[in-house]
């Protein structure tokens, strides 16, 4: 019998199913290490943690996308465990110091299986008052990955807490970043 490497305890298992609770997902070491946001804005309010964490993934995201969402999270875990950087901040520390609302602007990277792939930037929510990366993007990211795309799941600023152009600035920043790092991500720029 082979012993596990010493670092194995630092990684989570890619064993998420639609019946896994949100608390179990949020405590998975690889989800934590990857830095993926697993809340919707309205569900990260003080006093709602237990209610949210006790829900199954299926109840949280809905039954029609739960399996693809679980598969997408498991893919993310496998990528993270293999040393792939998942989360990319889109603003520098100086830019965040100038405007703290930029701190949460980031994307989550799902590399394609082959180099020089097309890519998709997946957005969630309604830009006005919420984003919902887990509920609306992870399943889509998985489906697109299965079709050969590199996928970037975007977390952007919503309007109520920011000026009217903030979401558009964030999306433009993401496209510019991906294009500028196309070779690193193994994606086509057109």
Predicted regions: what they are:
Residues 10-35:
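Short, structural beta-strand-to-alpha-helix junction motif
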Residues 127-130, 151, 177:
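Serine-hydrolase catalytic-loop signature spanning alpha/beta hydrolases and amidase-signature enzymes
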Residues 3-10:
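Sec-dependent signal peptide cleavage junction
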Residues 177-190:
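Gly/Ser-rich "nucleophile elbow"/oxyanion-hole loop immediately N-terminal to the catalytic nucleophile
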Residues 133-152:
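Short amphipathic alpha-helix adjacent to the substrate-entry channel of hydrolases
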Residues 117-126:
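Short beta-strand element of the alpha/beta-hydrolase
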Residues 29, 33-115, 162-164, 168:
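N-terminal cap/lid segment of alpha/beta-hydrolase-fold proteins
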Residues 126, 155-159:
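Short beta-to-alpha linker loops that shape the active-site pocket of alpha/beta-hydrolase fold enzymes
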């Amino acid at each position: 019998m082979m012993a596990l490497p010493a670092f194995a305890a630092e990684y989570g298992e890619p064993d998420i199913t639609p019946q896994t609770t949100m608390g179990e997902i949020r405590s998975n070491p690889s989800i934590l290490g990857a830095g993926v946001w697993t809340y919707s804005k309205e569900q990260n309010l003080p006093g709602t943690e237990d209610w949210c964490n006790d829900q199954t993934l299926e109840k949280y995201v809905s039954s029609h996308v739960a399996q693809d969402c679980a598969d997408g999270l498991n893919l993310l875990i496998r990528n993270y465990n293999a040393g792939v950087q998942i989360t990319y901040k889109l603003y520098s520390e100086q830019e965040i110091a100038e405007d703290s609302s930029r701190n949460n602007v980031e994307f989550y990277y799902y590399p394609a299986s082959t180099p020089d792939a097309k890519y998709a930037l997946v957005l969630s929510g309604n830009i006005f008052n919420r984003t919902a990366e887990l509920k609306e993007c992870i399943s889509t990211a998985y489906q697109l990955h299965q079709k050969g795309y590199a996928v970037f799941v975007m977390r952007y600023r919503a309007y109520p807490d920011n000026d009217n152009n903030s979401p558009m600035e964030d999306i433009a920043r993401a496209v510019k970043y991906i294009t500028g790092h196309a070779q690193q991500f193994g994606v086509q720029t057109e």
